Structure formats: structure tokens, C-alpha cells
């Protein structure tokens, strides 16, 4: 009835100064709280449980969504359940109590149920949404909710691991006892580890039955749990200890050199690619590295990597410095300088071929590429020198050291057209003068003939 009255007239339920004394919500910063807070705590899910329909999940309750808790739910305490009866029963229980391999007075289902209650009971009891005494109601609601179903999933995972552990123990028979320990069994040690300390975690060898190799340690450590699943590791360690120190072939437990992968070969090929005039040459080392690999490593050994030597051919670039002041004319013509450069480059290439050892196809390809790059650079230098020579022939750009190539071409075209026009003009004048000369010669001849 109070709820209906509040919904019909919300203003009457919210005076100016409202103060609720709720022990769960300490909101000092908010003097006016929403009207849907209740002074008394009521078990909403307990009322819904009595109905015939399935109660909604915790995340579907619209009223519980607006509850502003001071802090989120705390993480489950691992020390709170150490003294519970189920924990003591599991810790003191030894699966190998009987000779027939049974679980003593407890069946397999009872063992899994005790471990499930041990791992998931405290976490569920600490949640703020359910009654800790109502276990059936928790199972009906919490498992269906995506927010709280992690508890049941964790309990199911632990149950599956314990079942697989017991099955492996029964299949393998009696495990090999570890060195230095008498009659300790793997199962009893595993259950004793649960009651050792809350900060300790489950041994990884229980979850991962196969031993994990660590490259940093010289040899793996033998644990009581790992011997139950890897009986061959104990024999390998014992054989390694029994072998003398001076044996020529020691037992190699780990592979120091990783095998060559496809990515490594691709990187080597990319390094061998040559850009512009930089050539790459492979030199075989005088002595090959001998890598001794163990038979257990699978025969993977990295091939000897020949060092890559970068050689830069001496090419006369004659790059023009545009920022330099105007210099004097070159001593040698461009044609003579080109002959000297080409002769020097070809002589250097021939010397490299004579001094080198017999080459493979890759080395010959590198030589061809290097020769092509040298000739291409020489062609570019000749083209640059021709531009400079053309610039020196143009009167307007004769003293301009920073003239670009486009301006040189435009000015050269205009200058050529003007020179051609001047040539035509001079040719026509020459013809006129030649005719005038012919006329004067004829007149002079006539005057000589007329005089006695």
C-alpha cells in the first residue's frame, strides 16, 4: 500500500529535508535520496521464490539496478573457508586409502561435490543479492545469470580437472616415487597442497599433464605432481646424473639454436637486395661454423650465415654545387672526361672479376646489376654536364650557377631561334654583298678595257 501511495503522489513522499537511516548505504553527499529506497530490508527474492513462476535473474530486477552501493562486492576471501567442515574433510581425505583404488568411505561424486562447495560456496555466500542459507535458490537463479555464472563455471572446471586427474591416476597404476621421498603418494600430496596456505596456487603440472621446457634453466625440476604424469622425465634425469662428466656426448635437454624459419629467410633475401649503386657481395668465411646438435633436438641446425659485405663503387659523380660561387671553366672537355670515367669504372670492374674466386649465379647477377648501375649513373652525369655546357653557351645564363634545367631549356630554345633568325639575316646580306661585288668587278673590267 505504501508503494502505491508513493507512485500516485511522488511529491508527498519527498519532503525538502529527508534523512533515511539505512545502515547499508552511507551517502553523506546526497541529502535527498530517491524515493524507492526502503527503510527496512526486505528479501525480494525470498518472496518471489514462493510463487510458481521462475523468479527473474538478478540483472533483470529493475529496483535492484538503482541501488547505489558504497563499494563494489569484494573479491572472495581465500582464507575464510579454511576451517569449514568440507575443506577439512577434503584436506584429510586420501584417494588411495584402499587397495582397490577407491576413495575410502567417499565416492567420486561426493569428492567432487565437496571440492565444488569448497571453491564456490564462499564466493556465492559473499554476494549481496542472495541469502547464504538458501543453496537451492542460489543454484536456480545465479546459474542463469550471465553476470554470476562464473562461479558455477569455475566449480565445473575444477570438477572436470579432478575427474581427469583421478582417471589418469587409475590408468597409470602406481606412479613412480620421487627421489628423496618415501611413501608419499601423488594424490595425497595434491590434496594436502589445498590446505597448505591460501596464497599458494594449484601446481601447473596438475592442469598441464605434459612437462614444460624452460630455456633459462639447464634441466627441469622434478616435482611429486609432475612424476605422476611424466614418468619418463625421472628416468631422463637419472640417466643424466649417472652419465660421467667427461662423456663426449652429453644429454641435451634443450635446443639452444632455434631452427631457421621462413621469415628469417625472407629477411635475408631482403637484405641481399641492392638499391641504386650499392652492391652486395657475399664472402665465404675461411672456416665454417660447426654446430653440434643433439639427436633429440630433431636435427634442426641453423646453416652457416655468410656475412654480407657492402661495397660502394667509386663513381665520379661530379655533382654540381649550386650554392658555390661561380667557378672557372673546366680544364677537360666533357667528351674527354667521360672517356676517362668510363675507362676507370670498367678497369675497376675487371679487377674485381679477376681477384674474386669462382662465383655462383647469384654473384654474377650482382655483378651485372652493379655494372648496370654504374653505367646508369654515368649516363646521368653526362646528361647533367650537357645541361651545364648548354647553360654556359646562353648569354643570359652564362654566369647563373643556380639556373634550373627548365629555364636552361627555355632560354636555349629562344636563343637558338634568335641565332637562326640572325643567321638568315646575315646570309641575305652576304648574298647582296656578293652580287654587289660581282657588279663592281664587271664595271672595273669595262673601265680597264676602255682605257688605251
UniProtKB/Swiss-Prot annotation:
GO cellular component: cytoplasm; nuclear body; nucleolus; nucleoplasm; nucleus; spindle
Biased composition (Basic and acidic residues): 279-291, 328-344
Keyword DNA-binding on entry: yes
Main location: nucleus
Post-translational modification: Phosphorylated by PRKDC. Phosphorylation at Ser-342 by PIM2 leads to the stabilization of MYC. Phosphorylation at Ser-75 by CDK2 prevents Ras-induced senescence. Phosphorylated at Ser-75 by DYRK2; this primes the protein for subsequent phosphorylation by GSK3B at Thr-71. Phosphorylation at Thr-71 and Ser-75 by GSK3 is required for ubiquitination and degradation by the proteasome. Dephosphorylation at multiple sites by the PNUTS-PP1 complex promotes MYC stability by preventing ubiquitination by the SCF(FBXW7) complex. Ubiquitinated by the SCF(FBXW7) complex when phosphorylated at Thr-71 and Ser-75, leading to its degradation by the proteasome. Ubiquitination is counteracted by USP28 in the nucleoplasm and USP36 in the nucleolus, both interacting with of FBXW7, leading to its deubiquitination and preventing degradation. Also polyubiquitinated by the DCX(TRPC4AP) complex. Ubiquitinated by UBR5 when not forming a heterodimer with another bHLH protein, leading to its degradation: UBR5 recognizes and binds a degron that is only available upon heterodimer dissociation.
Gene3D superfamilies in UniProt: Helix-loop-helix DNA-binding domain (4.10.280.10)
Chain positions of cross-link Glycyl lysine isopeptide (Lys-Gly) (interchain with G-Cter in SUMO2): 65, 156, 161, 311
Biased composition (Polar residues): 348-360
Modified-residue entries (Phosphothreonine), positions: 21, 71, 328
Short motif (9aaTAD): ranges: 113-121
Annotated segments matching region Disordered: 214-377
GO BP field: chromatin remodeling; chromosome organization; DNA damage response; G1/S transition of mitotic cell cycle; intracellular iron ion homeostasis; intrinsic apoptotic signaling pathway; MAPK cascade; negative regulation of apoptotic process
Motif (UBR5-degron): 368-377
Biotechnology: POU5F1/OCT4, SOX2, MYC/c-Myc and KLF4 are the four Yamanaka factors. When combined, these factors are sufficient to reprogram differentiated cells to an embryonic-like state designated iPS (induced pluripotent stem) cells. iPS cells exhibit the morphology and growth properties of ES cells and express ES cell marker genes.
Keywords for this protein: Acetylation, Activator, Chromosome, Cytoplasm, DNA-binding, Glycoprotein, Isopeptide bond, Nucleus, Phosphoprotein, Proto-oncogene, Transcription, Transcription regulation, Ubl conjugation
Gene Ontology MF terms: DNA binding; DNA-binding transcription factor activity, RNA polymerase II-specific; E-box binding; protein dimerization activity; protein-containing complex binding; RNA polymerase II cis-regulatory region sequence-specific DNA binding
Domain bHLH: 367-419
General function of this protein: Transcription factor that binds DNA in a non-specific manner, yet also specifically recognizes the core sequence 5'-CAC[GA]TG-3'. Activates the transcription of growth-related genes. Binds to the VEGFA promoter, promoting VEGFA production and subsequent sprouting angiogenesis. Regulator of somatic reprogramming, controls self-renewal of embryonic stem cells. Functions with TAF6L to activate target gene expression through RNA polymerase II pause release.
Designated name of the protein: Myc proto-oncogene protein
Amino acid at each position: 500500500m505504501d508503494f502505491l501511495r508513493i507512485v500516485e503522489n511522488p511529491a508527498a513522499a519527498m519532503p525538502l529535508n529527508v534523512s533515511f537511516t539505512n545502515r547499508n548505504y552511507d551517502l553523506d553527499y546526497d541529502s535527498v535520496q530517491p524515493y524507492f529506497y526502503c527503510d527496512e530490508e526486505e528479501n525480494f527474492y525470498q518472496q518471489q521464490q514462493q510463487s510458481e513462476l521462475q523468479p527473474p535473474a538478478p540483472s533483470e530486477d529493475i529496483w535492484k539496478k538503482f541501488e547505489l552501493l558504497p563499494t563494489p562486492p569484494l573479491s572472495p576471501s581465500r582464507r575464510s573457508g579454511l576451517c569449514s567442515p568440507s575443506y577439512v574433510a577434503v584436506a584429510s581425505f586420501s584417494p588411495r586409502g584402499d587397495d582397490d583404488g577407491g576413495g575410502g568411505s567417499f565416492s567420486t561424486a561426493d569428492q567432487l561435490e565437496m571440492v565444488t562447495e569448497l571453491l564456490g560456496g564462499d564466493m556465492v555466500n559473499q554476494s549481496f543479492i542472495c541469502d547464504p542459507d538458501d543453496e537451492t535458490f542460489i543454484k536456480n537463479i545465479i546459474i542463469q545469470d550471465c553476470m554470476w555464472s562464473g562461479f558455477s563455471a569455475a566449480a565445473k572446471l575444477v570438477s572436470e580437472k579432478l575427474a581427469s586427474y583421478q582417471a589418469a591416476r587409475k590408468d597409470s597404476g602406481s606412479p613412480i616415487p620421487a627421489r628423496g621421498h618415501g611413501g608419499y603418494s601423488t594424490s595425497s600430496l595434491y590434496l594436502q597442497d589445498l590446505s597448505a596456505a591460501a596464497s599458494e596456487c594449484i601446481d601447473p603440472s596438475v592442469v598441464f599433464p605434459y612437462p614444460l621446457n624452460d630455456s633459462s634453466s639447464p634441466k627441469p625440476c622434478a616435482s611429486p605432481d609432475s612424476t605422476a604424469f611424466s614418468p619418463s622425465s625421472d628416468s631422463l634425469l637419472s640417466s643424466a646424473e649417472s652419465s660421467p662428466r667427461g662423456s663426449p656426448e652429453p644429454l641435451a635437454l634443450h635446443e639452444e639454436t632455434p631452427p631457421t624459419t621462413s621469415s628469417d629467410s625472407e629477411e635475408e633475401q631482403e637484405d641481399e637486395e641492392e638499391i641504386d649503386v650499392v652492391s652486395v657481395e657475399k664472402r665465404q668465411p675461411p672456416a665454417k661454423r660447426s654446430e653440434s646438435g643433439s639427436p633429440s633436438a630433431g636435427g634442426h641446425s641453423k646453416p652457416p650465415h655468410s656475412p654480407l659485405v657492402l661495397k660502394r663503387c667509386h663513381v665520379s659523380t661530379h655533382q654540381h654545387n649550386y650554392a658555390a660561387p661561380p667557378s672557372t671553366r673546366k680544364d677537360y672537355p666533357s667528351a674527354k672526361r667521360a672517356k676517362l670515367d668510363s675507362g676507370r669504372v670498367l678497369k675497376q670492374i675487371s679487377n674485381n672479376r679477376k681477384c674474386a674466386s669462382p662465383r655462383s649465379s647469384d654473384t654474377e647477377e650482382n655483378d651485372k646489376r652493379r655494372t648496370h648501375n654504374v653505367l646508369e649513373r654515368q649516363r646521368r652525369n653526362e646528361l647533367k654536364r650537357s645541361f651545364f655546357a648548354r647553360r654556359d653557351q646562353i648569354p643570359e645564363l652564362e654566369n647563373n650557377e643556380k639556373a634550373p634545367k627548365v629555364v636552361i631549356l627555355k632560354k636555349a630554345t629562344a636563343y637558338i631561334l634568335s641565332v637562326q633568325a640572325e643567321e638568315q639575316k646575315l646570309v641575305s646580306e652576304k648574298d647582296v654583298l656578293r652580287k654587289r661585288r660581282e657588279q663592281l668587278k664587271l664595271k672595273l673590267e669595262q673601265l680597264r678595257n676602255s682605257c688605251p
